[in-house]
Amino acid sequence: MAPTKKPQKNKQSKNEIASSLIPNSGHKKPSKAPKLLISPENEDRLRRLLLNFRRTPSPVTATLSVTQKRKKLNNLYENLSCEGFLDNQIELVLSSLRDGATLETALDWLCLNLPSHELPVNFSNGASRFPSTGRSVAVISKSKKDWNVSAESSVQEVKEVPESEVLVRVKSKRDEEEEDSLSSCQPSQADWIHQYMKRLEEEELESSDDERDKVSGPRSFEVIAKEYCVERYNAIKAKRKGDKSGQSQAGLAICKLKEEMNALGPSEAILESEFQRDRQDCEGAREKEVASSVLDDVHESVNADAFFFQLFDDLTLDTNPVGSCKSEEQESVVSNDSLDDLDLGDLFDEDVPPYVPSPHELLELQKKEIMRELCNEKHLTKLNGIWKKGEAQKIPKALLHQLCQRSGWIAPKFNKVTGEGRNFSYTTSVMRKSSGFGKSRQAGGLVTIQLPHQVEDFESIQDAQNRVAAFALHKLFSDLPVHFAITEPYASLVLIWKQEESLGITSREEQRREKFVESLLEADNFSLTTTSRGIHSALPMVDSCVKENDDLDVVKSNHRARRNSSMAAECSSLKQKQENKKKMQKYKDMLKTRAALPISEVKKDILQKLKEKDVLVVCGETGSGKTTQVPQFILDDMIDSGHGGYCNIICTQPRAITVAQRVADERCEPPPGFDNSVVAYQVRHQNARSDKTRLLFCTTGILLRKLVGDTTLKDVTHIIVDEVHERSLMGDFLLIILKSLIEKQSWDNALPKLKVILMSATVDAHQFSRYFGQCPIITAQGRTHPVTTYFLEDIYERTKYLLASDSPAALSSDTSITDKLGSVNVPRGKKNLMLAGWGDSYLVSEDSLNTSYDSIKYIASAVVDYDLLEELICHIDDTCEEGAILVFLPGMSEINMLLNRLAASYRFRGASGDWLLPLHSSIASTEQKKVFLRPPKGIRKVIIATNIAETSITIEDVVYVIDSGKHKENRYNPHKKLSSMVEDWVSKANARQRMGRAGRVKPGHCFSLYTRHRFEKLMRPYQVPEMLRVPLVELCLHIKLLGLGQIKPFLSKALEPPSESAINSAILLLHKVGALEGDEELTPLGHHLAKLPVDLLIGKMLLYGGIFGCLSPILSIAAFLSCCKSPFVYAKDEQNVDRVKLALLSDKLESSSNLNNNDRQSDHLLMVVAYEKWVRILHEQGFKAAESFCESKFLNSSVMRMMRERRVEFGMLLADIGLINLPKGKGRRKENFDVWFSDKTQPFNMYSQEPEVVKAILCAGLCPNIAEGLVNRLTKPAEETQRYAVWHDGKREVHIHRNSINKNCKAFQYPFIVFLEKLETKKVVYLQDTTVVSPFSILLFGGSINVHHQSGSVTIDGWLKLTAPAQTAVLFKELRLTLHSILKDLIRKPEKSGIVHNEVVKSMVHLLIEEGKPQHT
């Protein structure tokens, strides 16, 4: 007897559920998928919610013909039937899904809509998995409606359910225990499984032996056939002689031979074989006209032929071909009667007409031919080792057991199906292995087989089991002649089943299926016909529609006339105002100033070329005035010519606000956006325009957004693209669109003529001219004075500066460049590449430019030397004439650093400190105006700026320029899969632009903080276009949002097209994130991401953070991820930093977030806590207290300030698309916005204090950066001294970086982490900035999800596997699709900011919170 197992409890504790997620140890990657379970309450609630939500199904794009639809529906019907679903269930799902039905969607629909007890067992409870195969289980079964588990289910008698009702098979308690034992697959159960299977085999063999003993060995067919012919001959002779006694004896012998032949098996086939042979002999005898001496033999043959034919007909046409033989007396009477009626007829008559068989006879002949082939003994060799001719036939159960054993399958198992009365009915289950390759491959798995159209039960258990075993032999071993080896009546049954399949006899199920499929097709055709009729019925209305259209044309014509009249009045008004301004003295003075600019010399040429050509390139040196004057040239010309009302000029300008204000001042008009001002600006968060606007300065992004609603720009007369030489990503993208518009209007005269002006500050204008078909170029000379340039070696000599050994700008006190280069094994020719990281002081010393430059050897050129900057500014202030100082630094953090140092010095205290002016794009425009003012006499103005002051902004009184040689540009980090601002050296063109800023009013001086060698040999001639160095995902989203076609063909039209690999990488990432689907179709998520000008992963995180009500922590995490620096400053003693991190999570402040109470296994939540504590101290105690906090917690205060700026920037972006609301009446200060975004009472922060929700959204943003843990396995990496947990990222073994808070963890809440980036060394791959996330987060927000319904498992992103019942897995999949539908609805209603209250969103949040609660024993 098999060993018993303890029954499993109905409910698992949460600790058991959590522990089931821990994978086995000892493998390179998890060998068994973690098991996922949710509470029944949550599952039921989610299912009811999703069924009530009624998500709109995805539209079907592919159109199929009727034949293709029929084939598709038949295949689906067959596949679902094989999976164990009932006909009415299959018809229900196919009727619901119609053309959108696939096997996957149908299984999803069934798992979602059917109760658990109406599904095949594998779909409701997950699949059993066997050690030998590991394959999924496919079930063919029927069960009872109103399923109820009962301890007595194996013996309890249940009334038969009508066929019209849904049937679901009930498993006995013993069966369930056995299946559970097999599904567990634990190594400790191997002995139990082996013993259990051995017991089953012994029982089957004992049963088969008992049956075999009851069957006597039959004689061979040849012996029986020979005796049969002899007895038939004797019967004929006795009849001819009138011997009644002889006829009776022959009849009795014939009856016994018939019984023996029936016991042998396929009696119909035997008789058919004899009939064919004797018939041929008879026909041969007829053709030769045999002599009368053999007439008796011919008569005997003919009569035997007739008997065989009649007997075969009786057997083949009888519904029960194998029946009990009649009694001997009855058979004798029948035989005698048949012999009396025997007559040769006109067998030997001549002139017999040719025989033409009827259709029925043809069918009968076909049946006989099939039977003859089936009974051909040449196929017996296939049964070698199982049965051979002459051996006793076996019962079907025994033969099935042996064939399964030979195939390496687990022994068949018979399951009782309860029926009415005391009769019996059984099904059999066989676990098959997969076999074959390619198209001939057959999947393995558990197959449960039931008799077809079973209308009777069987009074004997053995009979019922042998019947279903015979059918299993027919289904599973159809290529074997099993009918030879099994006893009657089962052999005849197998032959009948084979004959039905060969003749294509349609069963009742097939008839039902065909009828259903045709009804679906007819319904589709009716729908199409109705549509067609609707179209035809609408034809009589064409005349009335044409009349309405004519009326509409009249209305449009009247509107056009009124508009023209209004425009004429506007043109006249603008011209009059222009004439009045020319009389104003202020305007006259301004005209004189404008006329003195170099660009005024080519004014006539510009206007003339624009009349002749559609595209013009204007190239002017810095200070020529092209940015402010060219737009005014065009506007003034149109106003003076009386067409000012039609004028609509858009100028793309990175510094739109400043330039617009400058132009408005020059025109003596009110500020942009006010009444009577034709100048306006529009940037991301500010819009200063009115109905009177005729000249708009905006960013490239604003113009692209306008293109979404107006792809032809029909109302725009001129587009001026300034600073095209900067080669920004969106700038080059805009050029592709403008070129397409120009080409389109060249052959379509109906389109308005758009004029395009490209303005560049460099001499590389010919490249743009060639791109637009050799368009004309107009060059204006710059107005500059000579500029003297001092390089780093000159600055050291002039200031006598000595680099301190402990300065941050020093490499080290004991290591020189020569030592560092010597330690690197690279050829001498590659030393220049190494110098890019350590500076070029080594080449300075080699060239022996000056012997006093010893300090330069130790300069780390990657670091800004603030000591040198401060000393140089003081040196200029002390030794040089008056004039403003312009300092170029890479970014805002560097600007703040230098400002703080200067403000703290004695020199710039008092009034002088008021003229320390920062200049950055994030500074308010009102504050930027001060840089154009002149300071009081005796005070030097110091402007500290980024590259904003490089081209567009011209500050007239600047005489001295200090150039750090650095700037920040957008770069793609392949490790982080993020784009970020990276500090790098400027190009030669950029450096010359900065030098030129010193010679605006008089000869100037430029102090370059890099060597002459770097400028002449190492700097690039021009900046690399962004399209060639940044990820293209944002650009691809804009292409799809604007409906510009396929991505690759469009980008191939660029000025410098990106590589195909870069395009493919972007498209692949968009598909993985869920922004694209199918053939580059934009999803609702992609539609929203296209409107967020941020990195793709951060954009997705922000979007979901607003939807799921945890915006504030997500803003902090997104700001942290987007910063290029870590907020933690790691001291030499890293253990102090680790202790501080733990203290941040442990120490609580009053009213602070409770994130730190619920979860400590997250570097990202650590940053949330750190930021919240820092900003609280900043608001309550001030700047100095916040600085002290940063010092005590090893935090970088500049990074914390940068995070606050990014938080505000990201929050404003979400407000722009209508996802959240902005405060009213609180001003535009960043502090106010940051407080608003942190307000826990706002709907978008409803769940901001729930760690599981925050981590789920973090998972959504960082996917596919997921790793699965081998939690029970510890190993010591090659570069470590301790043993740590091992993780797997789907490709290889990885480890958590030592700077992560999770590094020293030995027990994890879940075996899954998300991470920001990988750090790869020679031997180990590390994960930085990790967070432990739940499997529910991965199922909801991870990569692509693939549900394996039969095996009860889920695959995420193609590699991460979880074990979950099909119904549970489908729930999560449907939740994803429902969220997709919500995002789609948000597109139509962007102002619907209360989406956090959506019932589906609330249910998803509730699931994450409930299932993520701490486990208690």
Curated annotation (Swiss-Prot):
SMART domains: DEXDc, HA2, HELICc
Reactions that this protein is recorded to catalyse: ATP + H2O = ADP + phosphate + H(+)
Main location: plastid
A Gene Ontology cellular-component term: chloroplast
InterPro entries (UniProt xref): DEAD-box_helicase_OB_fold, DEAD/DEAH_box_helicase_dom, HA2_WH, Helicase-assoc_dom, Helicase_ATP-bd, Helicase_C-like, P-loop_NTPase, UBA_DHX29-like
UniProt-listed Pfam families: DEAD (PF00270), HA2_C (PF21010), HA2_N (PF04408), Helicase_C (PF00271), OB_NTP_bind (PF07717), UBA_DHX29 (PF24899)
Regions of compositional bias (Basic residues) in chain numbering: 1-12
Binding annotation for ATP: G620, E621, T622, G623, S624, G625, K626, T627
Region named Disordered: 1-37
Record domain Helicase ATP-binding: where: 607-781
Motif extent (DEIH box): 722-725
Keywords, sorted A to Z: ATP-binding, Chloroplast, Helicase, Hydrolase, Nucleotide-binding, Plastid, RNA-binding, Transit peptide
Keyword Thylakoid: no
Protein name from the UniProt record: DExH-box ATP-dependent RNA helicase DExH4, chloroplastic
